[in-house]
């Protein structure tokens, strides 16, 4: 039984004779061979939990060992000197990975490996047991805890233990390890690099690697003229870039520029396509671009061959043949066991005899041989294995299909001067492998990157590499070839495309391209790109070490006459931005601000990285010098985060100095300032002749004073001051009057400006200290006004509300259902107060447009969310309800956009007498659109029809009469006609699931349509039967469901002809492919198909409920849906 050892078995008995690793072996190779000879085997098996390990070898950069363990079946432990019954002991045999105490622990990792654990036999067959396992850091051993019993192994007749010695061998292969601490260096380990996957572009990466190692193709791409196309859409330039970087770079290459040149967007990179189809489309695109240039014949010379289709008479000298070119050969896999057998079947001739004789013209009917032969073979032969087929269902054929490393196609060819036997010998160059199922999976490529060298030097061996997107690794020949034959039940992985190279063309088309042979124009272009990328990368790295700051000074604050201290848009757009190092200390920031504001000098060069002892000492000396200075300013960090417990209303943002930056501390900016962009307030003294007052963090509060002058009706920021939080406001009245320029005994009224939307009167009757009276920290704004000029209609709070609520609004007319001849009014802009009554604004609009204001509906919407108002909009009283944003802020939103509609009735009827509903209607051109109506709640279906007629674009020849159908919503299994409502049906009796405000919110809809003239009159024995479209399965509905009149006992052929006339936009050729069926109403199951050659007639008893008239079955039209899903879309290169 295959298992992992018990946890205690993972504890290694230290060994002291571990030799150094054999450097002659590739430590990052794919396979390894381990051996362990256990002498004194009987002694080893005499004690439970004895263990021994082999010398380690390195494979994939990880140490591997054999681990042998003695196990007691009965679980008892015995002394070495006691007599034991060894028949109770089992021999455990494991492969161990990455468990060497001499190596540093690697953390989380995973490595998949397969192995054969073998006990050698001196005279006969050895014991071999296979394992495959995904080793990881918590499960490093895998094998057999009961490989075999001691008695069995020691039986002298079997020859496994000779002279008390047992010989263990292990052959294993391992994939590239993965994990956070594993950085696989493909270039170092293989000399090659991979291509990054953009999402599902593994198919493209696979064929691009094959093209790259076909150096004749790479050389042709290098030599192509890039033309004058823009770089973004230049496929030739993008292909050159990919190949150049694969040759010159040391890390995996991006393919984004190539897919952009194809005209693909980011979503296209997540659509997986067929590698064969992509190969053909790309080669065709490049061949087209090569026409008329020196490389015109490059692709045909590489990939094009010719085959002859022939019919040759056996008894007369007559042959008919046709020669066609090919760029790949597609071979069946189903029923074939090998590539040789598939080629044989492809070119095997058949005999035309008896009733199938060939008409040889003048020779009459003759026995003949019909077949295909290759008359010219290309240097690079692409063999497409047809593993994806439709056999009733879409499936992948994963049968075993072998292919050789060397292939001779002489038996499939017509040899002659143009094609000798030497031209038929091919060597396998690449194997493109698909793992997965029909609708998805993963592509990798195996390439023999040493094929040219081994062809030139017979002593050189194959060097197969596995290209798995950005990971490239060495692999064995068996892994590249035999493992991809398919047929394994556990691994749905098999070769899908083979690339063979003609032996006599290897030297010409696989010869390496030295860097010196790359055209200078190509090298120059991409070297300049590389230098530009390096500069941008260095710039980005430096930017990550820097941060942006804005210095807000008192003069900037004093220029603000509106909300808060400073408009945030000015901070971001008008004030110059500075750049500082994140590793700066606060003292260095003070020096920087001093130099910028007072010395007007640039930032001095400081070694922020302390690159050596001298630089570190210089920086320490500079910091001491700066701290000894007396700066006449203070720095504050301005933030917009705050909370106010005394109100629950949502407040607008504000930007205030809230955190003092102390020059004397040894604090770095990256720990003090958390954002990449910060706003710094520079506090000066209000009086240039006075020094900056002291600041005590435990006592003082930084406050700004804003004065409202009723004479000028304007706010002015006078300056800032420090309030002792333990004192009362009245103690500062004379100081505030002096700052404003008022007499010292002037009575003042105080407000706290918490935010633009919240100005709070300070209640001085409560004899509280400032710290208890106001809920503010540093950065508060005290708004001051004179008591004697403050009135109930003119005061600071009233002015702030006026500034906050007065907005500019753009009014745009909207239509529920626009009449064909109706022209919209022009847009206009108007200033309104958000406290205005909505009807007042409607009256002004009515007077401006000369319409009844009672019919003016004003509403708004969030962009992209909805296009029409709901009932709630009609209940709004003030304009404030039109503001859709969570918090109104006139600083951020300079102009609002509001819709209005001119209704055909007074808007107060909507909530009282009418119901808003949305339905579909079918226009004369066949298109279906949405329609919003407001029928009376007590009305009937005829009221809905009459209201809709006002908007319908009637055309000549129509009936002018409407009907209302209940239909299913667009989920495909529900998209059908359920019933036709009578005109006298009360609106209150309609299925309430169809009466709603949003089309997408319900499973059932209503649809209005004009009644065809031939369906106006319904006689006894006639019935309107629903018709649906479906694609193979009755539940896969699509298209527009409709009804058609049928008559009892009429021929079904007449129904078919009537359907043909109704579907007049369908071509005769397409209609001929339609199949007809009857589907059950309830579950949309197939009742039976309709045949038209047996005189079948309509039986109404089968079609409708005779009491209600509700259809019991549907007529189903079975044909291919015109909707092509993205997963099925053909691959296209647009440029």
Swiss-Prot record:
Mind telling me which Pfam families this protein's record contains? Answer: MATH (PF00917), UCH (PF00443), USP7_C2 (PF14533), USP7_ICP0_bdg (PF12436)
Q: Give one GO biological process term.
A: protein deubiquitination
Residues forming the MATH domain are 31-172
Q: List localization entries.
A: Nucleus
Q: Which GO terms describe its cellular component?
A: cytoplasm; cytosol; nucleus
Limits of the USP domain: 193-503
Gene Ontology terms, MF aspect: cysteine-type deubiquitinase activity; RNA polymerase II-specific DNA-binding transcription factor binding
Name the chemical reaction catalysed here: Thiol-dependent hydrolysis of ester, thioester, amide, peptide and isopeptide bonds formed by the C-terminal Gly of ubiquitin (a 76-residue protein attached to proteins as an intracellular targeting signal)
Role noted for this protein: Hydrolase that deubiquitinates target proteins. May play a role in regulating the levels of endogenous siRNA biogenesis.
Recorded protein name is: Ubiquitin carboxyl-terminal hydrolase 7
Organism name = Caenorhabditis elegans
Q: What is the lineage of its organism?
A: Eukaryota, Metazoa, Ecdysozoa, Nematoda, Chromadorea
Its gene is: math-33
């Amino acid at each position: 039984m295959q298992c992992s050892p018990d946890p205690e078995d993972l504890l290694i008995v230290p060994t002291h004779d571990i030799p150094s690793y054999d450097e002659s072996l590739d430590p990052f190779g794919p396979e390894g061979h381990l051996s362990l000879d256990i002498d004194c085997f009987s002694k080893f098996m005499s004690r439970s939990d004895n263990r021994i390990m082999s010398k380690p070898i390195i494979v994939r950069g990880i140490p591997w060992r054999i681990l042998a363990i003695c196990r007691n079946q009965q679980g008892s432990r015995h002394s070495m000197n006691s007599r034991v019954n060894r028949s109770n002991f089992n021999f455990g045999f494991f492969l161990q990975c990455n468990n060497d105490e001499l190596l540093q622990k690697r953390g989380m990792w995973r490595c998949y490996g397969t192995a054969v654990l073998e006990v050698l036999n001196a005279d006969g067959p050895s014991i071999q047991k296979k394992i495959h396992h995904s080793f990881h850091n918590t499960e490093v051993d895998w094998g057999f805890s009961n490989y075999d019993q001691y008695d069995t192994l020691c039986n002298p007749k079997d020859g496994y233990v000779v002279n008390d010695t047992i010989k263990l061998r292990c052959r294993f292969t391992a994939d590239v390890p993965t994990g956070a601490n594993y950085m696989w260096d493909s270039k170092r380990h293989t000399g090659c690099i991979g291509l990054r996957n953009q999402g599902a572009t593994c198919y493209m990466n696979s064929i691009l690697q094959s093209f790259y190692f076909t150096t004749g193709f790479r050389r042709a791409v290098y030599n192509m003229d890039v033309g004058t196309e823009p770089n973004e859409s230049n496929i030739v330039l993008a292909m050159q870039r990919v190949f150049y970087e694969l040759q010159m770079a040391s890390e995996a290459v991006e393919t984004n520029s190539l897919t952009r040149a194809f005209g693909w967007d980011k979503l296209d990179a997540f659509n997986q396509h067929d590698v064969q189809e992509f190969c053909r489309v790309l080669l065709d695109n490049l061949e087209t671009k090569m026409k008329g240039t020196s490389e015109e014949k490059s692709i045909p010379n590489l990939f094009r061959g010719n085959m002859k289709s022939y019919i040759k008479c056996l008894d007369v000298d007559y042959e008919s043949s046709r020669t066609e070119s090919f760029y790949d050969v597609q071979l069946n896999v189903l029923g074939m066991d090998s590539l040789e057998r598939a080629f044989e079947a492809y070119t095997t001739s058949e005999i035309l005899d008896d009733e199938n004789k060939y008409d040889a013209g003048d020779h009459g009917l003759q026995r003949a041989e019909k077949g295909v032969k290759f008359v010219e073979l290309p240097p690079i032969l692409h063999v497409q294995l047809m593993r994806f087929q439709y056999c009733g269902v879409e499936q992948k054929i994963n049968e075993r299909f072998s292919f050789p490393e060397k292939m001779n196609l002489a038996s499939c060819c017509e040899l002659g001067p143009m094609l000798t036997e030497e031209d038929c010998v091919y060597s396998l160059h690449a194997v493109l492998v698909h793992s997965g199922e029909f609708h998805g999976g993963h592509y990798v490529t195996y390439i023999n990157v040493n094929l040219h060298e081994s062809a030139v030097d017979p002593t050189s061996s194959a060097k197969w590499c596995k290209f798995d997107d950005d990971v490239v690794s060495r692999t064995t020949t068996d892994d590249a070839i035999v493992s991809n034959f398919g047929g394994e039940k556990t691994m749905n992985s098999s070769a899908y495309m083979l690339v063979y190279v003609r032996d006599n063309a290897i030297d010409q088309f696989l010869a390496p391209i030295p860097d010196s042979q790359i055209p200078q124009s190509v090298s120059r272009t991409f070297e300049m790109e590389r230098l530009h990328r390096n500069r941008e990368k260095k710039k980005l790295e430096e930017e990550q070490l820097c941060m942006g700051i804005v210095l807000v000074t008192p003069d900037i604050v004093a220029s603000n006459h509106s909300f808060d201290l400073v408009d945030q848009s000015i901070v971001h757009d008008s004030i110059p931005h500075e750049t500082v190092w994140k590793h700066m200390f606060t003292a260095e920031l003070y020096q920087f601000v001093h130099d910028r504001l007072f010395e007007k000098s640039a930032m001095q060069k400081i070694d922020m990285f302390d690159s050596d002892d001298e630089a570190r000492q210089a920086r320490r000396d500079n910091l001491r010098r700066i701290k000894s200075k007396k700066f006449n300013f203070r720095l504050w960090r301005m933030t917009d985060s705050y909370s106010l417990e005394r109100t629950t209303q949502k407040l607008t943002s504000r930007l205030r100095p809230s955190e003092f930056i102390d020059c004397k501390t040894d604090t770095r900016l990256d720990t003090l300032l958390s954002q990449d962009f910060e706003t710094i307030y520079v506090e000066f003294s209000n009086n240039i002749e006075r020094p900056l007052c002291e600041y005590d963090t435990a006592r003082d509060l930084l406050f700004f004073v804003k004065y409202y002058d009723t004479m000028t009706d304007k706010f002015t920021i006078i300056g800032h001051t420090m309030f002792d939080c333990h004192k009362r406001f009245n103690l500062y009245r004379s100081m505030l009057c002096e700052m404003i320029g008022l007499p010292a005994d002037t009575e003042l009224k105080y407000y706290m400006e918490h935010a633009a939307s919240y100005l709070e009167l300070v209640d001085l009757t409560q004899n509280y200290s400032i710290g208890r009276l106001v809920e503010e920290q540093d950065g508060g704004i005290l708004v001051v006004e004179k008591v004697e000029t403050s009135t109930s209609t003119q005061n600071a709070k009233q002015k702030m509300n006026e500034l906050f609520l007065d907005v500019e609004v753009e009014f745009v007319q909207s239509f529920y259902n626009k009449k064909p001849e109706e022209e919209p009014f022009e847009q206009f802009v108007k200033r309104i107060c958000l406290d205005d009554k909505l009807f007042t604004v409607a009256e002004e609009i009515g007077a401006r447009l000369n319409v009844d204001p009672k019919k003016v509906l004003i509403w708004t919407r969030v962009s992209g969310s909805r296009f029409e108002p709901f009932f709630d909009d009609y209940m709004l009283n003030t304009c404030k309800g039109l503001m859709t944003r969570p918090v109104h802020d006139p600083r951020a939103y300079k102009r609002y956009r509001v819709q209005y509609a001119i209704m055909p009735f007074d808007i107060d009827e909507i909530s009282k007498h009418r119901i808003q509903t949305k339905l579909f209607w079918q226009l004369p051109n066949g298109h279906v659109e949405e329609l919003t109506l407001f029928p009376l709640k007590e009305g009937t279906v005829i009221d809905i029809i009459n209201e809709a007629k006002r908007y319908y674009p009637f055309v000549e020849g129509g009936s002018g009469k409407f009907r209302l159908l209940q239909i299913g919503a667009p989920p495909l299994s529900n998209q059908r006609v359920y019933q036709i409502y009578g005109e006298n049906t009360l609106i209150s009796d309609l299925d309430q699931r169809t009466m709603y405000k949003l089309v997408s919110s319900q499973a059932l809809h209503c649809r209005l349509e004009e009644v065809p003239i031939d369906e106006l009159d319904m006689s006894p024995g006639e019935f309107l039967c629903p018709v649906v479209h479906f694609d193979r399965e009755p539940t896969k509905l699509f298209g527009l469901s409709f009804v058609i009149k049928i008559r009892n006992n009429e021929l079904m052929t007449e129904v078919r002809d009537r359907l043909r006339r109704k579907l007049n936009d369908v071509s005769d050729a397409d209609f001929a492919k339609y199949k007809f069926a009857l589907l059950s109403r309830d579950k949309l199951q197939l009742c039976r198909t309709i045949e038209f050659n047996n005189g079948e007639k309509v039986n109404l008893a089968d079609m409708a409920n005779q009491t209600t008239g509700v259809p019991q079955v549907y007529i189903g039209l079975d044909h291919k849906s015109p909707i092509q899903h993205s997963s099925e879309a053909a691959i296209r290169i647009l440029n």
